[in-house]
């Protein structure tokens, strides 16, 4: 499979009183064509900022990409101007946001919002765009698509709005779909519908998905590969099967054992002590050291780098340094 | 914890809570939102009853009606045998409120931002005129320490704390009056997973220490399975199924429970069998205009003609396994 997106050493900083706050601090990963990659982490881990950096949306909220590159096929997105971005947003890369309640324009009908994208990117005539919009709505499971075209967002429920968002996001057959917590605000039965739908559509159009979520159940159902983030850094990168079978990083292990499971019993949940440090107050050594049950002396002073473990998985932890050295 | 032969602490008998819909010039009543529509169950001392359901199913309204934040439209709420459904506010405060407390979902909205932790946690003592000033302050520090916060935090304001810490404050506040029953409405759903586990563990420890009874309302089926002894499933204001948690999760009878359980994504180990997922069609109907007959028949994969006509009775299909479905009558 060829690589679609490659992110290298991405650093996105925000500034408060000229003090840099490293929200994303050296993130590397790639997504192949047709692959679904999940970006997992708790709030404050930088997963959403990573996706906004790819979409070129951090500048407007005061952030700045300090270093690194984002390559979409052969284009370097970090050198893009706002005008360049307008050509690819919605067309080659599109995004589904977390809040279906706030991400649609409340004063435009659903029809107007879908046709807008088609008219802008595909140069369609209004009539043609309308026809395509109805098809898209049918594709995402609306039986009365014609009526839905005339409705305003407040008339639809959360699940319906999220499906409209998916229809808009897929309207131009993008190469990459970024889904930022697409099902978090939805009920489980509706979540199942939306996940099923995303899977079907992506198989049909060979779209790659970057799925951002904190729900490990969703990851296990929908993703091929998982990237675990903590405090703006990638701490582990593995296939779904490997990660759930044998988590390497103590943080990943903590995450997996802290969730109650529906098909079994755990006597006591294994809570990770403490809480995520804020990006302006990071520990000097490994960022997970203060919460890590396996922390060693050097973890408090030295920052581990991302090591390649056997079987091609990467992990940022001193525990695997020895094995990594043997490998190379 | 075995709660089988313990005393009943709270009992609901066919409780209904309707909210009127008003419209027009004179704000005449034109209909009802049937948020809770005939729910009966009982809570035994020391047990945890989980209530699950999708948003809009009435689980929060049921919780709030139980503590009499809402006055039920119909039906009886018996707290230790006493009917509290019609008590006045004053009588409630004197006899009931001390014994039933609530933990709310949003730890950012449920604490007064202008008050220090000390005055937030102390307030119930003031209301009920308990202890001297000094004792009150000592109690506050004791409680803070018990929920895992440093007693020196008492002088700080809520905004200085993270979500998980605030939820601990909410729990400390609920514990001030030594209640017997705590109604927890989605207490962990606003928290990150690693913090969620801390709060769940804390609630379990406190239950053992103070012999608390919990009513745990949540949409997260895995969390409810972990913490509860018995679980009730609600849909459109009605209880669909209620039984012990092992029975419910291993052998769900109601088609809605089956669909609900199958739609929860699970972390799957390599080689394990993929479960058959029942994807429900459509959305939750509006509680202002619920379907006739069984409220679930519009989305039910196994609906029969009788389901459109008759409301199924909520009855015991197997020993202590209650279900409201025509398949089992």
From Swiss-Prot, chain A:
One biological process term in Gene Ontology: peptide transport
GO cellular component assignments: plasma membrane
Binding site for ATP: 41-48
Membrane topology reported for the UniProt record: Peripheral membrane protein
Domain of life: Bacteria
Transmembrane recorded as keyword: no
Cellular localisation: Cell membrane
Main location: membrane
Region forming the signal peptide: none
Pfam family, one: ABC_tran
Gene Ontology MF: a single term: ATP binding
Keyword Cell membrane: yes
ABC transporter domain residues: 5-256
Keywords: ATP-binding, Cell membrane, Competence, Membrane, Nucleotide-binding, Peptide transport, Protein transport, Sporulation, Transport
Function comment: This protein is a component of an oligopeptide permease, a binding protein-dependent transport system. This APP system can completely substitute for the OPP system in both sporulation and genetic competence, though, unlike OPP, is incapable of transporting tripeptides. Probably responsible for energy coupling to the transport system.
PANTHER family, per the entry: DIPEPTIDE TRANSPORT ATP-BINDING PROTEIN DPPD, OLIGOPEPTIDE TRANSPORT ATP-BINDING PROTEIN APPD
NCBIfam families xref list: oligo_HPY
Entry's family note: Belongs to the ABC transporter superfamily.
Entry protein name: Oligopeptide transport ATP-binding protein AppD
Organism expressing this protein natively: Bacillus subtilis (strain 168)
Gene field: appD
From Swiss-Prot, chain B:
A GO cellular component annotation in the UniProt record: plasma membrane
Family indicated by similarity: Belongs to the ABC transporter superfamily.
Organism this protein belongs to: Bacillus subtilis (strain 168)
Keyword Ribonucleoprotein attached: no
Domain ABC transporter: 10-261
Main location: membrane
The keyword NADP belongs to this UniProt entry's keyword annotation: no
Binding site for ATP: 53-60
Function: This protein is a component of an oligopeptide permease, a binding protein-dependent transport system. This APP system can completely substitute for the OPP system in both sporulation and genetic competence, though, unlike OPP, is incapable of transporting tripeptides. Probably responsible for energy coupling to the transport system.
Domain of life from the UniProt record: Bacteria
Name recorded for this polypeptide: Oligopeptide transport ATP-binding protein AppF
Cell compartment(s), UniProt: Cell membrane
């Amino acid at each position: 499979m060829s690589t679609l997106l490659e992110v290298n050493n991405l650093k996105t900083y925000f500034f408060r009183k000229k003090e840099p706050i490293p929200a994303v601090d050296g993130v590397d990963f790639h997504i192949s064509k047709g692959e679904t990659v999940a970006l997992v982490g708790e709030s404050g881990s930088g997963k959403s900022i990573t996706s906004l950096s790819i979409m070129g949306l951090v500048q407007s909220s005061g952030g700045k990409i300090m270093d690194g590159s984002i390559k979409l096929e052969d284009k370097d997105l970090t050198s893009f101007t706002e005008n360049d971005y307008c050509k690819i947003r919605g067309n080659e890369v599109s995004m589904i946001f977390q809040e279906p309640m706030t991400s649609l324009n409340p004063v435009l009908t659903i029809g107007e919002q879908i046709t807008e994208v088609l008219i802008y990117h595909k140069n369609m005539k209004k009539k043609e765009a309308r026809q395509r919009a109805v098809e898209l709505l049918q594709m995402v499971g609306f039986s009365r698509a014609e009526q839905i075209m005339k409705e305003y967002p407040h008339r639809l429920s959360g699940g319906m709005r999220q499906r409209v968002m998916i229809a808009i996001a897929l309207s131009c057959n993008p190469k990459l779909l970024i889904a930022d917590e697409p099902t978090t605000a939805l009920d489980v039965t509706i979540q199942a519908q939306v996940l099923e739908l995303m899977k079907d559509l992506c198989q049909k159009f060979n779209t790659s998905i970057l799925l951002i979520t904190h729900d490990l159940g969703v990851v296990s159902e929908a993703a091929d590969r998982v990237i675990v983030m903590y405090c703006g850094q990638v701490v582990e990168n593995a296939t779904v099967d490997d990660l759930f079978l044998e988590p390497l990083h103590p943080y990943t292990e903590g995450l997996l054992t802290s969730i109650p499971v529906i098909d079994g019993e755990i006597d006591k949940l294994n809570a990770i002590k403490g809480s995520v440090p804020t990006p302006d107050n990071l520990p000097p050594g490994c960022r997970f050291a203060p919460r890590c049950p396996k922390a060693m002396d050097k973890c408090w002073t030295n920052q581990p780098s991302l090591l390649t473990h056997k079987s091609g998985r990467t992990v940022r932890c001193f525990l695997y340094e020895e094995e990594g050295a043997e490998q190379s | 914890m075995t709660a089988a032969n313990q005393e009943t602490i709270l009992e609901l008998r066919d409780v209904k809570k309707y909210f009127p819909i008003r419209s027009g010039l004179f704000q005449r009543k034109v209909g009802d939102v049937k948020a809770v529509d005939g729910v009966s169950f009982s809570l035994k001392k020391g047990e945890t009853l989980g209530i699950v359901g999708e948003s809009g199913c009435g689980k929060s309204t049921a919780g709030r009606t139980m503590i009499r934040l809402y006055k039920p439209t119909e039906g009886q709420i018996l707290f230790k045998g006493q009917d509290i459904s019609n008590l006045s506010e004053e009588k409630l405060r004197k006899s009931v409120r001390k014994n039933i407390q609530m933990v709310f979902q949003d730890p950012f909205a449920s604490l007064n931002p202008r008050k220090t932790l000390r005055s937030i946690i102390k307030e119930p003592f003031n209301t009920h005129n308990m202890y001297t000033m000094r004792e009150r302050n000592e109690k506050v520090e004791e409680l803070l320490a018990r929920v895992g916060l440093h007693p020196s935090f008492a002088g700080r304001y809520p905004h200085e704390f993270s979500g998980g810490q605030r939820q601990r404050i909410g729990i400390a506040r609920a514990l001030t009056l030594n209640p017997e029953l705590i109604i927890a409405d989605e207490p962990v759903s606003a928290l990150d997973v690693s913090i969620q586990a801390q709060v769940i563990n804390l609630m379990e420890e406190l239950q053992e220490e103070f012999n608390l009874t919990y009513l745990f309302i949540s949409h997260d089926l895995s969390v409810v399975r972990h913490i509860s002894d018995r679980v009730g499933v609600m849909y459109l204001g009605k209880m669909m199924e209620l039984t012990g948690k092992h029975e419910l999760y291993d052998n769900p009878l109601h088609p809605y429970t089956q669909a609900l359980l199958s739609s929860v994504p699970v972390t799957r180990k390599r080689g394990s069998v993929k479960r058959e997922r029942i994807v429900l069609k459509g959305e939750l109907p509006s509680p202002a205009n619920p379907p006739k007959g069984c409220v679930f028949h519009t989305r039910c994969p196994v609906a029969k003609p009788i389901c459109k006509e008759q409301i199924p009775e909520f009855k015991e299909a197997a020993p202590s396994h209650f279900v409201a479905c025509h398949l089992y009558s």
